[in-house]
């Protein structure tokens, strides 16, 4: 994921956080408040007891962007019926777009490929640029 983002010209910072919605919430808020425009989280979107990434995103109180997760689940069904179990989520918090992707490397790759064509436009809209 990092290499693919860098190939698109993004500055990438990668971190591994411990489980827990509160830790993730604080970290996401700090990054978004510092001016980061896009945060991609991987993992914690399943049905397991430690899967709390969507809850951390919702706790931010930003604007939900449900279409991104809906698109990924819909397109992901062509790869596996299990995509419908994903609790992927996306929110706009201030001027930052935060997307919670599944944790498996294959699902991350597939979902990033699905989102790549629309991410630049989404970020431009958040920045207040024209809706070209």
Please name every model-derived segment.
Residues 1-132:
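Non-catalytic beta/alpha edge segments that cap or flank active sites
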